[in-house]
Amino acid sequence: RELDALGGEMGKNIDKTFIQSKMLNESKGPAVHSLRAQADKQDYTSEMRRVLENTDHLTIRQAEISEILTEPAEEGGEKKRITGVKALSGAVYHCRAVVLATGVYLGARCVYGDVSNPTGPNGLQAANHLTDSLKEHGIEMYRFKTGTPARADRRSIDFSKMEEQFGDKRVVPFSFSTDPETVQREQVSCWLTYTNEKTHEIIRENLDRSPLFSGAIEGTGPCLL
């Protein structure tokens, strides 16, 4: 799988921390088979951090990068080369190359119905300074959107009225380097429910507040997280 490229720690990590794994579209041809795993969020984060902190030749610094630093590649020329990055604190890290893994934080906005907030997901701040720096270097920004379903407290749910959905009996690892026998473990079920006339009524009465229909957000998507 493509997750095994460049070391593939994401695939290895989900194999260690998934709570359910399922191969989707198995009734169709192999070209559309899609492996889906759901993780214990805290375990995934802790395990990935442990791996990073114990990786040789990797130094970790926590800071908000606000500026990409460059200089002319040739005297009098228009082309530029990277010289480093600058943090919001003023600290400068010199380098010859920069890899940006920005996720969904460049100029991020979170939209809840008719409320829009200039922030990243889960209350984490958006990388607005870095966004401005990239624009200054001639890099165009396009808006992508994701849709995140509401999180429900399991204590408020009547599971007896829902359909239980199990993970695969024989789990396929995400990483080719994972021993398949190490991922055969007890899993957490998913649960399926349906809308009804009441939920349809609520939706119809509030369509004008939905950013997908009101035009409040634009961009390619959506992707559900």
What feature does the model see in each segment?
Residues 98, 102-103, 225:
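Core structural elements
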Residues 67-92, 98:
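Conserved beta-strand-loop-beta-strand element in the redox core of flavoprotein oxidoreductases
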Residues 206-225:
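Active-site helix-to-loop segments that bind/position phosphate- or nucleotide-bearing substrates
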Residues 1-69, 89, 101-121, 125-131, ...:
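Conserved N-terminal/central alpha/beta ligand/cofactor-binding core
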Residues 30, 77-78, 85, 168, ...:
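Intrinsically disordered, low-complexity regions
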